[in-house]
Amino acid sequence: MKQFIVSVAILAFTFPIFSWNNHAGITYLILKDHWKGKPTPKVKVESLKTFLSKEKSSIQETLSISEEWALKKLPHLTPTIESLKFSKTTKDADLVLSFYKALRVNPNHKAALYIQAVPKRNGTKLPLDQLTTLNEKGKLVNETFLSLQEGQIIGADEVLVSATDEPDYDLDLYLFEDNGSEVGKIYGFGSQPFGNPAIEFSSQAPFHMGFYYEPGIIFAFAGFLKQTYPEYRIHQFTELSKLAFRTGHPYWGYRFAGWALHYIQDLTQPYHSSVLPRVSAAKQIGVQLVSIVGYQSPKNNMINFISGRHTLIEEYQYYLIRNLIETKNWDHPVANSITEFSEQSFVKWQGIDLLRGNVCKEAYDAGDPMDEQLENLDIPKYETLYEPTHPIHTILGTLLNNTSKHTRAYLDALKSN
């Protein structure tokens, strides 16, 4: 009977999936003073194929380091099958595809040479279909992407700003065996543990969320919530970044670092580290059980109640950050929360092994008070930006201060390696 209830609960358990919108805008504000008055490093643009062709003897060794770490850390992760592993004898024409499959990411990701222009500026625009395979482009249609040429010199900040947004473009889409893709059948991730496998953007959710602090009874009924992979991605791209810097490829050093930062920034978002803030374990289980026998309204009401606040904070953050950058309103309290750091405010990057204990625990603990504060605002949905003294900016400023803090710590560690 218990197995039946657990099986049905797994099928019934659903919740809204959101992440920080506008990673590029947030990272732009963080990097405004990152080099503290020193010239921003310049790097030469390099295609992924060029990087792989020059360093192909080291690629699989680097990926194996990450996999060995991840297999010890993530009991649900299965080893990469031999046929997917990157070979130093791979033909040049197959390098990029082989690399993607060895990473176990979307093999159709484009890795175009581009920057996301933050703030907007003129240049040769890159069509969105050369950047992403997403059918629903969402807010990407609002952004400006400029095409680059191999050998062009650009700032490291431009690489990082652009790269922190890139994993959302399709890198983790359709990787599970029930997503209807060919790679989903061979990557070994099994069936999608949560979210709707039939919905495009939802298929990436287990790679961008990490639930480590739910009550034990929740994990007992919904153990699938443990099947997440952001740490795997952070480790992979951090090791690749180190390899790129070590072997004289700073463009890819920064770009891989930006990819890793995307997942770190996602985990600073409380709704990515807590399933349903302020909903007790008893209530979560209760509404799931009554839904099994046909009463869907309690579950639907609970999800709609919380998803409204998810949507509000995401939408508001997106349009506010865009506005702050476009108007250069650096004195706004949210801008100050991101950019103003005293020596006492800085933290050291503790490594991926301690990610759960600092980044994720901090976000989880912030979930309940944040959710209550948002409810008390009584704002049903985003409609307009409010005056700087509005309490929504205190909430958002606190959250983005944490995002900024951990981004800075990661980049400081990167500079010291």
Task: List each model region and its residues.
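Sec-dependent signal peptide recognition
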Residues: 2-8
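Residue-level marker of positions within ordered structural domains that often coincide
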Residues: 6, 246, 412
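N-terminal signal peptide c-region/cleavage motif recognized by signal peptidases
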Residues: 14-16
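N-terminal, motif-rich segments that launch catalysis or mediate targeting to/interaction with membranes
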Residues: 18-243, 273-417
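Active-site beta-strand/loop microenvironment that shapes enzyme catalytic pockets
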Residues: 241-278
